[in-house]
Amino acid sequence: MNLHEYQGKQLFAEYGLPVSKGYAVDSPKEAAEACDKIGGTQWVVKAQVHAGGRGKAGGVKLVRSKDEARAFAQQWLDKRLVTYQTDANGQPVSKILVEACTDIDKELYLGAVVDRASRRIVFMASTEGGVDIEKVAHDTPEKILKATIDPLVGAQPFQARELAFQLGLKGDQVKQFVHIFVGLAQLFQDYDLALLEVNPLVIKTDGNLHCLDAKINIDSNAIYRQPKLRDMADPSQDDPREAHAAKWELNYVALDGNIGCMVNGAGLAMGTMDIVNLHGGAPANFLDVGGGATEERVTEAFKIILSDSNVAAVLVNIFGGIVRCDMIAEGIIGAVREVGVKVPVVVRLEGNNADLGAKMLSESGLNIIGANSLTDAAIQVVKAAEGK
């Protein structure tokens, strides 16, 4: 689950971290009023969406009058912002963040992520702030500085000082960086975060450090124990298919291809996508129905897959372990009939009662193509998607 920038900065402020004075507004009138509350002669207005690249897409602007702030809000509220991180439909804008203008001398990067290899929280810092950090890591990995947090003792000031010196900070800047580093580490731990970024962390013209942006991603497996963050969720930013899948405890991720995939087990699902790619196909989604592939869940899975107009064929790849393949076949037949599937469906069943399940599918009279192996299934679904 992601938070908006204004929500992330609210959390930063609670931990005493330096952020700009600002207000999240949902009307042009409130945008103008926010300028009065903040004071000054220049403000920054930012469209609030769960995506990067807002500035290049026109979603961030420096304004010099209340009328400009009002006009920006009028332009973007209830519209969709398309950036390089969104699909062609973009993300809906329901709030605008109006902030005091910050005079910047230099931009840095500071972020933290759960590193699965070390099973630790790892902080990353760089002198290359305000740009895509993934590109920096790819092109100039030596510019990424790291500090690994020991979960038994937490973030230590000496780690922050080491990073600060490598970033070229001096005097009071080092003390300020230690404060920000330790505060962010505590925030990361307290709220079960998966990722946190301040990009950019800026040095202002007066020499002080300032958190100019806030990106926060919460571990979805820990949301149940973070009611405060759960209440911050903005469903309008979620893919409606992924939201539908979550209600049925289906793991679904939309992709750009035209072959729908329904598989039980995340590892098998990834392997299925790989072999479809190997044979020239492009998966339209990742969908793991889990161990409880009941007729009801299979029906909902079909509905979700077919809600994507790009889907030209569907591959169902099920391994019957605890759940028998004949029961799965029953569910597939019932789902295809209920949903009224118009595209070819290729089914590969393996495991418990696989032969009986395959027989039921072949005798169903439906447009279901049986496959005798995963390779055969991939070849057949690619041909079906191409209309061959």
From Swiss-Prot:
One Gene Ontology CC term in the entry: cytosol
Function: Succinyl-CoA synthetase functions in the citric acid cycle (TCA), coupling the hydrolysis of succinyl-CoA to the synthesis of either ATP or GTP and thus represents the only step of substrate-level phosphorylation in the TCA. The beta subunit provides nucleotide specificity of the enzyme and binds the substrate succinate, while the binding sites for coenzyme A and phosphate are found in the alpha subunit.
GO BP terms in the entry: succinyl-CoA metabolic process; tricarboxylic acid cycle
UniProt cofactor(s): Mg(2+)
Binding site residues for Mg(2+): N199, D213
Protein residues bound to substrate: N264, G321, I322, V323
Gene3D superfamilies, per database record: ATP-grasp fold, A domain, ATP-grasp fold, B domain, Succinyl-CoA synthetase domains
Subunit relationships: Heterotetramer of two alpha and two beta subunits.
UniProt name for this protein: Succinate--CoA ligase [ADP-forming] subunit beta
Family: Belongs to the succinate/malate CoA ligase beta subunit family.
SUPFAM superfamilies, sorted: Glutathione synthetase ATP-binding domain-like, Succinyl-CoA synthetase domains
Residues reported to bind ATP: K46, G53, R54, G55, E99, T102, E107
Pathway connected to this protein: Carbohydrate metabolism; tricarboxylic acid cycle; succinate from succinyl-CoA (ligase route): step 1/1
Taxonomy of the source species: Bacteria, Pseudomonadati, Pseudomonadota, Gammaproteobacteria, Pseudomonadales
Pfam families according to UniProt: ATP-grasp_2, Ligase_CoA
Protein species of origin: Stutzerimonas stutzeri (strain A1501) (Pseudomonas stutzeri)
One term of GO molecular function: ATP binding
Comment on bound cofactor: Binds 1 Mg(2+) ion per subunit.
